[in-house]
Amino acid sequence: MTSPLCFWCFCVWAAANWPPGSALQLQPGMPNVCREEQLTLVRLSRPCAQAFIDTIQFWKQGCSGPRWCVGYERRIRYYIIYRHVYATEHQTVFRCCPGWIQWDDEPGCFSSLSSLGTHFSGRECSYQDTRQCLCSQGFHGPHCQYEKNKHLESELTPGFLQKNVDECAVVNGGCQQRCINTLGTFHCECDTGYRRHADERTCIKTDPCAGANGCAHLCQTENGMARCACHAGYQLSEDKKACEDINECAGELAPCAHHCVNSKGSFTCTCHPGFELGADRKHCYRIELEIVNICEKNNGGCSHHCEPAIGGAHCSCNHGHQLDTDGKTCIDFDECESGEACCAQLCINYLGGYECSCEEGFQISSDGCGCDALDEQLEEEEEEIDILRFPGRLAQNPPQPFPYLDPSLTASYEDEDNDDADSEAEGEVQGLTALYRVVCLDGTFGLDCSLSCEDCMNGGRCQEGKSGCLCPAEWTGLICNESSVLRTGEDQQAPAGCLKGFFGKNCKRKCHCANNVHCHRVYGACMCDLGRYGRFCHLSCPRGAYGASCSLECQCVEENTLECSAKNGSCTCKSGYQGNRCQEELPLPA
């Protein structure tokens, strides 16, 4: 059910295209072309919004109890119609100025109406399709307005008096701008910025900047003359055509607060370290940041390690663990199940790591991963062979091969599988005397004579005779790679160290450290080299720190320094600076 409803109209005026006319042929700037305003009848389309009322059905509740019933509702709908109306508008057209006419497709109005039908010297000039006046004998000119100079024709006649006729005195000689009279004739000239037409009398406006006039950037017209100009940041060179860059930084053209960097056609302001450039790109403002460490509170929600990051805390786990789905909780990573374990035969997983084992008839190899077959005869002999323990050395008796054996060392014999022998056995062992001791040659030392003074770490110096390392107070071990202060805070001397990558009673357990660094003989904790830190020595020192555990602060002048060595804190200076802290500027060359 619908019913019409009179509503309102939103009208938008849209002008139709102008019909083609003389304005498309004659343009402003053409010779003798004038602008005219005229009224033109145009048709316009006017959109209007119409409204009507529509009645729709819908289901509603509450008719009688919980039942539904049909209801009716009136809604207003709209549609758009277009109506055509006619109106008068002012339009600009270009026509020939009064007294002038355009012929065919001439670029302007070059013919004067005043000359049509004009009588000169009793002769009528007829303007036909040839657009040339047919002059009678004895007359000349575009409108036959000049009489031929009989005096010039008879100049060779003896005694004849010559008299010049000024053709420019009559209608300016037919010239549009300037008429130049000469002896016996004349010619037309044009003002600056114009050129003569093919008829030698009409002047056409020229563009002096046509072809850019050789200007590198811009060509501008002033009083009919071309003049070169440059973009901002450039200036004209001596030839008045090329453009060269203006160094704003050399003078006072660049109002930079701190530093100025020149560029082609412009410049850029920069600030001292610790400042930032303002919105005006000229002034500098000190940077004041409030550093909030999100990891200080509740370790950032991380189970193990927390590092501040953009957007919040970044959690990481100890070796042998992995992040749970919440990105914060660390759970055990089963290397045996994942296949990342290096075990050749048996793998035993434990919290945070794993160990390799071998089947019966095999023994673990020196790399802690593989399994070597036991020789049956050696296996029987090992049941009867005791273990001879030297200080820092464990080997079967006799200890073969050794680089050099020297009698004099007191040692004890004990069973390898029973570190806690009973007192009676100890009494018997105490009475035994070893017949050999290990002596390394050629400046080597260590359990298997594989170390030298080049392996001394953490500031350790070579002992006299190159028989070991002299360690600073806070370090110990064969090569000064173990801290003398344990995690409990008590000053204790740690046992002698193992080779890089191993720890444990027999130096057979693998360290889980990055970069193949030493680890604690007993605990397996990573002992970082200079310039590295972190639980696994996997992190390089942050900028501005160096030394053991990155605990020392670089003393370099930051704004003059390219790099501070993470190992020893030495400064690498930027170009133009010198000194142990890059604190001195190099003198300018004379």
Curated annotation (Swiss-Prot):
InterPro entries attached to this UniProt entry: EGF-like_Ca-bd_dom, EGF-like_dom, EGF-type_Asp/Asn_hydroxyl_site, EGF_Ca-bd_CS, EMI_domain, Growth_fac_rcpt_cys_sf, MEGF/SIB, NOTCH1_EGF-like
Top-rank taxon, per record: Eukaryota
Residue ranges of domain EMI in the record: 44-104
Alphabetical list of Gene3D superfamilies matching this protein: Laminin, Tie2 ligand-binding domain superfamily
Compositionally skewed regions (Acidic residues) per UniProt: 413-424
Chain spans, region Disordered: 393-424
Annotated S-S bridges: C109-C125, C135-C144, C168-C179, C175-C188, C190-C203, C209-C219, C215-C228, C230-C243, C249-C260, C256-C269, C271-C284, C449-C462, C456-C469, C471-C480
Pfam families listed in its UniProt record: EGF_CA, EMI, FXa_inhibition
Signal peptide residues on this chain, from the entry's feature table: 1-23
Keyword field: Calcium, Disulfide bond, EGF-like domain, Repeat, Signal
Limits of the EGF-like domain: 105-145, 164-204, 205-244, 245-285, 445-481
Matches recorded under SUPFAM superfamilies: EGF/Laminin, Growth factor receptor domain
Descriptive protein name: EGF-like and EMI domain-containing protein 1
